[in-house]
Structure formats: C-alpha cells, structure tokens
C-alpha cells in the first residue's frame, strides 16, 4: 500500500508524491495551494488535495486531507506542477481559484485566511476582474468576494 522509492532518491515532498501516485486527478487546493503561491503565512499541517465529487479518496499514511469538489467545476483554474526531485506531476489550482475556494469554504479554513490571501494577491498586482470571472463559475463565491473587494478598495 505504500509508495516505494529507491534509497538514493533525492529529497522531495513525499506527501505530494503519494497524492499524485494514488490519484492522477489529485489537485493541490485550499491552504496548501495558497501556501504554494505564497499567498498565506499559514503553514499547513496537512496537504489539502481536491478530487472530483463521487471519487473515492485513497487510503494513505501521509498527512493528506481529501476534499471533494464538484465535477462540473473541478477543472476551473486547474494546472499542473512537477514535484521537485521526481518526474511526478500533480494538479494545482491557480491563485484566483485558490482565493475563490478560500472564500467559498471560509467556514472550513477561516475568513481571515481568505481575506489575507486576497490582500496579498492584490498587493502583487492581481486583477480583480480575473478573480470575479473565476468566482462567477463557482457556487456561493461571487458575493463574498465582491464584498471583500469593496472593503479592501
């Protein structure tokens, strides 16, 4: 059930490797994705990984939190990134999608995390129109983002 690697393999983030090998559609999301994009100061205690709703999360020994996202919006803002030290790739949501998910699931990760990520993204030159376009594709997202943008401007 484990992921087997050679003893002389280079150091890597083995939680990412395990998630990517267990499910080909695994996608880094929420706080883990915000941390990957340097949009939060929060250090995730586990890897947040999205899979399509209806898919069964694999059994792993790694510190992975599996989240089920709707199949119709699963690919919105989804790209891939290679896992350092390996030839493995894993899905990663764009900064706009990460912020939209943070507001959509603010009850799970906290409003402050979502707000701080939005502030940092805007400080770096993020365009509100691109964020609103992504938010319009996701349920329960557009209104809280519009309110936060109004307060921050």
Task: Show which residues each predicted segment covers.
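Short beta-edge/loop segments at beta->alpha junctions of small alpha/beta modules
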Residues: 1-32, 54-55, 59-61, 152-153
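Hydrophobic alpha-helical segments and helix-packing faces
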Residues: 26, 40-42, 92
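Hydrophobic alpha-helical interaction segments
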Residues: 79-153
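Exposed, interaction-prone assembly regions rather than primary DNA-binding/catalytic cores
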Residues: 35-79
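Short amphipathic alpha-helical segments and their helix-coil junctions
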Residues: 8-15, 74-86
């Amino acid at each position: 059930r484990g992921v087997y690697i050679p003893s002389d393999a280079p150091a890597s983030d083995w939680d990412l490797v395990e998630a990517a090998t267990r499910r080909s559609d695994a996608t880094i999301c929420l706080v883990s994705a915000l941390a990957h994009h340097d949009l939060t100061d929060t250090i995730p205690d586990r890897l947040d990984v999205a899979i399509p709703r209806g898919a069964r999360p694999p059994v792993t020994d790694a510190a992975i939190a599996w989240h089920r996202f709707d199949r119709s919006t699963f690919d919105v803002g989804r790209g891939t990134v290679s896992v350092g030290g390996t030839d493995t790739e894993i899905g990663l949501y764009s900064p706009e999608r990460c912020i939209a998910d943070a507001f959509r699931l603010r009850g799970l990760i906290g409003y402050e995390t979502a707000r701080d990520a939005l502030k940092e993204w805007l400080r770096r030159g993020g365009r509100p129109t691109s964020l609103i376009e992504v938010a319009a594709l996701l349920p329960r997202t557009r209104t809280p983002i519009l309110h936060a943008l109004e307060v921050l401007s």
